[in-house]
Amino acid sequence: MDLILTTFGTYLHRQGEMFVVKIKEQKQEVSSRKVRSIVITTGASLSTDAIELAVEKNIDIVFLDQVGHPYGRVWHGRPGSTTAIRREQLRLADTEKGLRLALGWLLRKFDNQVEFLREARQRRSRLSAALTEKINALLELRKSLEAVNGELEMVRGTIMGFEGRAGRTYWEAVNLLLPDHFQFEARSRNPAKDEFNCLLNYSYGVLYGTVERACILAGLDPYVGFVHTDHYQKKSLVFDLIECYRIWADETVVGLFAARKVKPDLFDRLQNGLTLNKEGKVVLMGQFSEYLDESIRYRNRNIKRRDTVQLDCHRMANEWIGRISDEDDSDAGVDTV
């Protein structure tokens, strides 16, 4: 399991083969055999004895900043599972198997988008014909993408071409779901040109942090991607994996407009666009956090929606090194204190 220390003033130390979590006068003992990683946020501390035990047991210690982004990590210097995982990640990146992995993530994104539009079509009969046209176009592009073969290096441009065409089709459909005065011309970033893109960009930023953290805890290298190439200081794998989860932000932001919670005073004007102000962040994150924390049924267990990212990353890493079967997710728990 992942031992996550979030309470201000938490102190972690060692007692034999046990980790002891102390919060004021309360203590909780956790067997080191059950811990896969220790995640520490601001305001918590740990002893050097606890660090030594973690190193002995090949347990990663990850430090997160105030917004949940990893900024540091402690692990042992001996070859272990993280080394094996990253070696396999590098090997897969330019193989046919790597291509199938990358296509799987994008196909999952397409499926999420189609399902979202189908559900929207059921609720908005006046848009049925227009949404059906977009859905059918996405399904045709999905077929083309699924048929791609070869090594990633040779077909990367083809994949990104299909992805670009699908993106334009999808956003044209999403635009139909918004009130007329909030509709947008195209996707825009840094800064957003309109309210929809402003909310969406901030939501995607939250997801980037979630996916990066999950990669690091699972022993994956966030900088070695498959579709997105590993340019210097570019978290390519994060850009690849986030495709599976973008729909969470899409659904949340469209839902805010549908509920008429989006007002002009949630945004501040810039010279060339918009930025989300403090009130806007409260409105967005209240809705988004509730959505991410919702308990869902996933891989035969009840789990928070946000924790499925961690489960997916651990599962993938373990499969790469032959550690688990398709049915075994028994070690993917999270304990937060």
What are these regions (language model features)?
Residues 32-46:
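Extracellular/luminal Protease-associated
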Residues 47, 67-73:
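Short gly/pro/ser/thr-enriched loop/turn and capping motifs at secondary-structure boundaries
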Residues 38-41, 59-65:
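Short hydrophobic alpha-helical runs that function as membrane-insertion/retention elements
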Residues 1-15, 21-24, 29, 71, ...:
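Active-site helix-to-loop segments that bind/position phosphate- or nucleotide-bearing substrates
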Residues 43-46, 51-53, 58:
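Compact, well-ordered interaction domains used in eukaryotic information-processing assemblies
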Residues 36, 48, 52, 205:
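Short alpha-helical basic/polar micro-motif
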Residues 76-80:
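Short low-complexity, flexible loop/linker segments enriched in glycine and/or proline
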